């Protein structure tokens, strides 16, 4: 008989809701703002409340939960919080589509998604939950903004943006499709508008240097991406004096990391907005029209790299700083005014963009670097890559500088030009200051006031927060705050005169740059974080999220930590000690293509599949009409490909524990996971077997007893397997994050325990230890099942400890020896680990299955200690 209150069959849904209620009633995962003893902060990137969880969320939060539950078993106090990244454009777009206030849409989504997360069985302290769209949260973001503005770390300047004249709004680059607004279809204009910027460049060197302190805890790939994004380079500012001082007196100063190519300059390119270009266009309508065309183009650096090269000669010239020769000045659409000085020296022989441009406009190409240091190298269309790609070449065609290599040439040009005031050495960063103004309604109000007399004045601290009105239903025609005098009309804090409140809101990356710190004391009303809570919990010990956040979010959060440190809010230099970037979740795609080439995508749930004996899909039909669909292969789950699997459907059918085990078993966490219905069923079968093993053992009613000193060989083997599994699972979770191999080890322990026959009370004690260990080690992955079954063994999972390894159980008294004849396996022996070589050979030869092969004389006897005997006859 099973115990009175437990089913013989695994009923996931019944036990999961019961266990979740137990956790809620006991506040099982609540922690204090300050904590003594060993403690740890585990954080998964918080979700945007889009309305429904997707499988990427399930993977992210299950990884965080496995790590959290593991450390709780290890006796540590673990903070694992959850909240909502709640501002942003999708809420505004949904509000426009459904004619509902973004606040209402957002909070309804939060309620639904919170319920979904709870059903996943996450060990979260829900008392710390917050949404970033509440004044209690963004009050302190505004407070920090004011402090930074006063210190000069935030400034305002004109910036070129994409303007939709119909919607009266600014568009992000990705919202411009073929030059038109994605919603209105109107031709997009370029406008210069004032925007606020964070001086992240002031921290560029520190952001770069501190990456070295993360090398043991962050993936190398992420560190490299951040290094490249910050992009420190040592180069030279070189001035080309004006050859037309009567028109444009100032020379052109360019920054280059390749001063060694100076003698290969055949033209200088400037941005369309460069003062020299504007001066040249004053009496040149054609040039003025070209400048306007460039201004209308994309402002994204990535687009410029791939866009068609466009240019026009200004008719002005500068003098080469070494030779004094006149060099033409061209306007080129690949030069950005916002980068460096807005001018570049063009060396077509050794730079791809310059080469394409020179070819298009028939400008000279002069080779000045050659790997072979030969003057007679033929220039070819493809050779520039070879010449430019390496700094190991030698200067040619460079007059007095011929024969010099990169560093020597750099030093020689500097020595020649610096005394004339035409050059100086300079460190530059690719990183640009962070523009945070958004001409949107659903965001954190920027706490600034515009006064005609006083200019920009920060809102006094006692008047914070500036609260965003939440009963607004936007209609898509610009920022509704601009039509609300009750919001923007105010008085100037400096002069008391009539003034206008800033109606731009902050980039939502600002909220996600400091939320991790707020979790330490979410209800604190005296500042961003309670000092003693920050002292207790920060930095985050383990951060988990997608690699797509490697640059922006993680860089901004690192920047904010340093800003908060310098305001005395937090200590330490970095927010996240360890980072785990989980891979994508992939699923099969299915579609039909119309004659026009338009694809209609079908959800995998609506597809009837036929598979071959190896499980591969051979045909697919849409269940709606029974007709074939095209099998598109596996791609990242997405709305656009309609290949998302609803986590709720999996939880309803199999239970959260099955979903969790599948997600952790299907692939290492940092690699892509291929969704597989068969894999989900396999995870469910595994849990059913665990359930049957445990309930079957309980049914027998064995009395509890200590492990005996003397055990049968089978019992010794099972104990060894049990303690090897403790060792492996502990290492796999803590050090390697190899959750898939940890589960594989639990499957092996399940197999070994299932095969073990209990014949004595001592055997029962060993089996009980194996089952209790299996359930405890499984708890981070399948907490509902584990807690339910452990309770039947008299163990409360919430108070349970990770099992400790009994070293004596790992030692082997016997070993299995393979016996070969002429290199072929013919038998096996179980012998003492201390057996002598002679005794081993004697026992091997005495095996009946071996003797039949020993008819002739034995030529050779090979013994590999602890492994095999090979008899050559």
UniProtKB/Swiss-Prot annotation:
ATP binds at residue 639. GO terms for molecular function: aminoacyl-tRNA deacylase activity; ATP binding; leucine-tRNA ligase activity. It catalyses: tRNA(Leu) + L-leucine + ATP = L-leucyl-tRNA(Leu) + AMP + diphosphate. It is found in: Cytoplasm. GO terms for cellular component: cytosol. It comes from Acinetobacter baylyi (strain ATCC 33305 / BD413 / ADP1). Belongs to the class-I aminoacyl-tRNA synthetase family. Its main location: cytoplasm. A motif ('KMSKS' region) lies at residues 636-640. The keyword Protein transport does not apply. The keyword Chaperone does not apply. InterPro entries: aa-tRNA-synth_I_CS, aa-tRNA-synth_Ia, Leu-tRNA-ligase, Leu_tRNA-synth_edit, M/V/L/I-tRNA-synth_anticd-bd, Methionyl/Leucyl_tRNA_Synth, Rossmann-like_a/b/a_fold, tRNAsynth_Ia_anticodon-bd. GO terms for biological process: leucyl-tRNA aminoacylation. This is Leucine--tRNA ligase.
């Amino acid at each position: 008989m099973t115990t009175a209150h437990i089913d013989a069959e695994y009923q996931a849904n019944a036990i999961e809701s019961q266990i979740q209620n137990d956790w809620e009633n006991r506040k099982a995962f609540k922690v204090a703002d300050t904590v003594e003893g060993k403690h740890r902060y585990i954080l998964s990137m918080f979700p945007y409340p889009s309305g429904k969880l997707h499988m990427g969320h399930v993977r992210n939060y299950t990884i965080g939960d496995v790590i959290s539950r593991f450390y709780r078993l290890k006796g540590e106090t673990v903070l694992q919080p959850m909240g909502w990244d709640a501002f942003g454009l999708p809420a505004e777009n949904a509000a426009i589509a459904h004619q509902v206030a973004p606040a209402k849409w957002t909070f309804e989504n939060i309620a639904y998604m919170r319920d979904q997360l709870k059903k996943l069985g996450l060990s979260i302290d829900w008392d710390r939950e917050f949404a970033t769209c509440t004044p209690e949260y963004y009050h302190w973001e505004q407070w920090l903004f004011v402090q930074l503005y006063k210190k000069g770390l935030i400034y305002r300047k004109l910036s070129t943006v994409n303007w939709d004249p119909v919607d009266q709004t600014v568009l992000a680059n990705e919202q411009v499709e073929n030059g038109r607004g994605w919603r209105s279809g109107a031709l997009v204009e370029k406008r210069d508008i004032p925007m606020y910027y964070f001086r992240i460049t002031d921290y560029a060197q520190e952001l770069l240097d501190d990456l070295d302190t993360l090398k043991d805890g962050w993936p190398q790939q992420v560190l490299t991406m951040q290094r490249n994004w910050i992009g420190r380079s040592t180069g030279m500012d070189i001035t080309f004096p004006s050859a037309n001082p009567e028109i444009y007196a100032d020379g052109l100063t360019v920054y280059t990391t390749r001063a060694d190519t100076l003698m290969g300059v055949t033209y200088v390119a400037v941005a369309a907005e460069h003062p020299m270009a504007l001066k040249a266009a004053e009496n040149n309508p054609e040039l003025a029209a070209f400048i306007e065309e460039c201004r209308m183009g994309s402002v994204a650096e990535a687009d410029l790299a791939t866009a068609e090269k466009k240019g026009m000669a200004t008719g002005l010239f500068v003098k080469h700083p070494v030779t004094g020769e006149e060099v033409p000045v061209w306007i080129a659409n690949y030069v950005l005014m916002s980068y460096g000085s807005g001018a570049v020296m063009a060396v077509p022989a050794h730079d791809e963009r310059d080469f394409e441009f020179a070819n298009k406009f028939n400008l000279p190409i002069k080779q000045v670097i050659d790997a072979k240091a030969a003057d007679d190298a033929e220039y070819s269309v493809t050779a520039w890559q070879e010449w430019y790609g390496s700094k190991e070449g030698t200067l040619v065609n460079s007059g007095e500088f011929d024969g010099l290599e990169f560093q020597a040439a750099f030093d020689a040009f500097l020595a020649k030009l610096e005394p004339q005031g035409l050059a100086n050495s300079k460190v530059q960063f690719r990183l640009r200051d962070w523009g945070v103004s958004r001409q949107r309604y659903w965001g954190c109000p920027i706490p600034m006031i515009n006064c005609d007399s006083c200019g920009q004045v920060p809102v006094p601290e006692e008047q914070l927060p500036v609260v965003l009105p939440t009963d607004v239903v936007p209609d898509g025609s610009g920022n509704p705050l601009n039509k609300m005098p009750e919001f923007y009309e105010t008085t100037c804090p400096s002069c008391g005169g009539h003034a206008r409140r800033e109606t731009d809101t902050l980039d939502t990356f600002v909220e996600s740059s400091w939320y991790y710190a707020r979790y330490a004391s979410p209800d604190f009303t005296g500042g961003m974080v309670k000092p003693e809570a920050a002292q207790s919990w920060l930095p985050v010990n383990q951060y988990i999220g997608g690699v797509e956040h490697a640059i922006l979010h993680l860089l901004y959060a690192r920047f904010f930590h340093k800003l908060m440190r310098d305001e005395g809010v937090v200590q330490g230099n970095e927010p996240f000690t360890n980072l785990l970037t989980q891979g994508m979740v992939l699923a099969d795609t299915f579609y039909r293509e119309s004659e026009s080439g338009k694809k209609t995508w079908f959800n995998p749930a609506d597809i009837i599949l036929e598979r071959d004996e190896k499980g591969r899909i051979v045909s697919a039909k849409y269940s709606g009409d029974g007709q074939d669909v095209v099998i598109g292969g596996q791609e990242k789950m997405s709305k656009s490909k309609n290949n998302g699997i609803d986590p709720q459907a999996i939880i309803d059918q199999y239970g959260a524990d099955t979903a969790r085990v599948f997600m952790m078993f299907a692939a290492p966490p940092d690699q892509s996971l291929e969704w597989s219905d068969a894999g989900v069923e396999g995870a469910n079968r595994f849990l059913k077997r665990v359930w049957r093993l445990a309930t079957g053992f309980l049914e027998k009613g064995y009395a509890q007893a200590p492990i005996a000193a003397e055990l049968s060989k089978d019992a010794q083997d099972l104990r060894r397997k049990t303690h090897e599994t403790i060792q492996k699972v502990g290492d796999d979770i803590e050090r390697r994050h190899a959750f898939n191999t940890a589960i594989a080890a639990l499957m092996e322990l399940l197999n070994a325990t299932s095969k073990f026959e209990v014949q004595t009370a001592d055997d029962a004690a060993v089996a009980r230890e194996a089952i209790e260990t299996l359930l405890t080690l499984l708890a981070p992955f399948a907490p509902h099942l584990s807690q339910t079954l452990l309770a039947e063994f008299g163990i409360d999972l919430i108070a349970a400890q990770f099992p400790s390894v009994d070293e004596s159980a790992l030692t082997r008294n016997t070993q299995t020896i393979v016996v070969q004849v002429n290199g072929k396996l013919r038998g096996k022996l179980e012998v003492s680990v201390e057996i002598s070589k002679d005794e081993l050979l004697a026992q091997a030869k005495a095996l009946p299955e071996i003797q039949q092969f020993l008819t002739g004389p034995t030529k050779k006897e090979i013994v590999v200690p602890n492994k095999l005997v090979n008899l050559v006859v």
